[in-house]
Amino acid sequence: MSTIPISKEGFAKIKAELASLKKERPEVIKAIAEAREEGDLKENGGYHAARERQGMLEAKINYIESRIPQFNVVDMTTLGGEKITFGATVTLEDIDTGAEKTYTIMGPDESDFKKGIISIESPVGKALLGKIEGDEVVVNAPKGKIEYGIVSVIFNGPIS
């Protein structure tokens, strides 16, 4: 079983989400019981909606619980160095256009592309791992190959 890197903050968010989902369980069970009391289950939209909600809730709980043992919780304040690893904030320059982009490389459970946080497992994340400032990388993106120059590599600590 491989490990999944995650920050302490990210792990705390996932544990809080799990607690919230578990807290929701009794409400869903109550909604199912109330809908069942309404009679004919074949045409009872409330019952079917509550059962569907229960299924999605249980699937999410099971998914999170199955991932927790795989997490490798990383103290972001201990990260550093020249090489790009989990937790690095990297500024890239598109060799063709000259456009710069800045990404922070995190685990898959913390990635948020809109915030510039990419997964260590993404095409860009995979291409950057182990590289240093000044290197060039080719990313096999869905729209084709993109060549980037690595402008800077820094470690900022916790990401929120």
From Swiss-Prot:
The keyword Coiled coil applies. It holds the Pfam family GreA_GreB_N. GO terms for molecular function: DNA binding; RNA polymerase binding. Signal peptide: none annotated. PROSITE patterns: GREAB_1 (PS00829), GREAB_2 (PS00830). Disulfide bonds: none annotated. Residues 14-38 form a coiled coil. The keyword Transcription applies. InterPro entries: GreA/GreB_C_sf (IPR036953), TF_GreA/GreB_CS (IPR018151), Tscrpt_elong_fac_GreA (IPR006359), Tscrpt_elong_fac_GreA/B (IPR028624), Tscrpt_elong_fac_GreA/B_C (IPR001437), Tscrpt_elong_fac_GreA/B_fam (IPR023459), Tscrpt_elong_fac_GreA/B_N (IPR022691), Tscrpt_elong_fac_GreA/B_N_sf (IPR036805). GO terms for biological process: DNA-templated transcription elongation; regulation of DNA-templated transcription elongation. Keywords: Coiled coil, DNA-binding, Transcription, Transcription regulation. Necessary for efficient RNA polymerase transcription elongation past template-encoded arresting sites. The arresting sites in DNA have the property of trapping a certain fraction of elongating RNA polymerases that pass through, resulting in locked ternary complexes. Cleavage of the nascent transcript by cleavage factors such as GreA or GreB allows the resumption of elongation from the new 3'terminus. GreA releases sequences of 2 to 3 nucleotides. Belongs to the GreA/GreB family. This is Transcription elongation factor GreA. It comes from Maridesulfovibrio salexigens (strain ATCC 14822 / DSM 2638 / NCIMB 8403 / VKM B-1763).
